[in-house]
């Protein structure tokens, strides 16, 4: 069950870190990637069992598993290489863009975690499930969600 989504843009600077301008000119290999991505958080409801649901008349108690990141992905249609520079004696690392994209995916995931995506997933699930269960006729709804970290 998806309950929170963040869309994030990050700038990733990768490649060799030559501090000497001359060495960078000859041997450097740098990339600047503008990454757009989405992180979706929610709950794996396949972890629920009968013991996680207690019904007494019109009261219901539901114990959900901890929220988790379900998807963290780059939008390849919007993620672009802004700049790529290679030294005149360097053919370039053919995997540099792949490495930058992997770093971008991790950075986007970390940014969502720092932005509180798991807490937002918990809050949204509690609101949505409470409204749904009350619409089904339950008068008192208790939803327990353990805290989680990325």
Where are these regions (language model features)?
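Domain-level marker for long, solvent-exposed, non-transmembrane regions
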Residues: 1-150
């Amino acid at each position: 069950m998806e309950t929170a989504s963040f869309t994030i843009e990050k700038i990733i600077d990768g490649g060799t870190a030559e501090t000497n301008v001359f060495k960078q000119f000859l041997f450097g290999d740098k990339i600047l990637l503008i990454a757009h991505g989405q992180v979706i958080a929610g709950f794996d409801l396949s972890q629920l069992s009968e013991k996680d649901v207690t019904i007494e008349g019109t009261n219901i108690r539901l114990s959900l598993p901890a929220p988790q990141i379900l998807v963290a992905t780059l939008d390849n249609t919007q993620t672009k290489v802004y700049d790529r520079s290679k030294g005149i004696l360097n053919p370039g690392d053919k995997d540099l863009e792949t490495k930058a994209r992997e770093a971008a995916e991790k950075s986007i995931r970390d940014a969502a975690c720092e932005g509180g995506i798991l807490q937002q997933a918990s809050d949204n699930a509690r609101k949505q499930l409470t409204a749904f269960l009350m619409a089904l006729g339950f008068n008192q709804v208790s939803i327990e969600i353990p805290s989680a970290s990325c």
